[in-house]
Amino acid sequence: MASGPILQVNGIEKAFGGIRAVDRCSLAVLPGSITGLIGPNGAGKSTLFNIIAGLYRPDGGEIWFGDARIDGLPPYEIVRLGLTKTWQIPHELRNLTVLENLVLAAKDNAGERLINLFIKPGEVKRDEIRCRARAREVLKLTQLEGLANEHARSLSGGQKKLLELSRALMSDPTLVLLDEPVAGVNPALTGSLMDLIEKLRQNGRTFFLIEHDMNVVMNRCDWVIVMHQGRRIAEGRPETVKADPAVIESYLGG
């Protein structure tokens, strides 16, 4: 792994109606890592992810993605820079096929602008062919190729998690934020999903994930960060964090 962080969060603050959800939180994620973010419900984890992804504007602090300062940028600009996020509850387009869900998530698709259908029809057609080819590559990677023409609403919970990750990969991200990627997924598919994430990491991607499954966190993450009451209270290798008295008291429950 490179020595400098791919993501640097400095003193981020966010309050909702006087309740401070994120309280001067600072952390870093190294490139090529699988970094876990844990903490009790209400610790501010998902709020922090939404701030990083541009869905919430912070009240204070800075966020750097590589050399780019991204706090306050709209989500689509952050995605273009190479950072994307999946959702704890998949946001699939239920009435479209699995393949169509991926095509719509493709990066730099000329068909996104209606006017191009009239002034650049050839470019739109070429982009559609390119996006469909890329979508099939991703579906093969995520083992959903056999479901390409099925409606997304017909997928199981675990398959929808794979679809969510597949859609994220269509933007060719460098860093992927995963919000509880194995929540509600059966043990067999959990193993397959984490194997896939490990394979993607080996191919150059970085993952920062929120997860409550301690088996996944302790066995699959290189580094673990712990939040409590909006702040980072501990970080380190999984075995170190697991033995930290502050973590045991606030989250792991002894």
Enumerate the predicted regions with their spans.
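The feature captures the beta-strand-to-loop junction immediately N-terminal to the Walker
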Residues: 38-40
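Helix-to-loop junction immediately C-terminal to a conserved catalytic motif
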Residues: 53
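Conserved ABC transporter NBD signature motif
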Residues: 61-70, 80-81
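Conserved ABC ATPase "signature" region
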Residues: 114-147, 195-198
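Conserved catalytic motifs of ABC-family nucleotide-binding domains
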Residues: 172
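Catalytic Walker B motif of ABC-type/P-loop ATPase nucleotide-binding domains
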Residues: 176-180
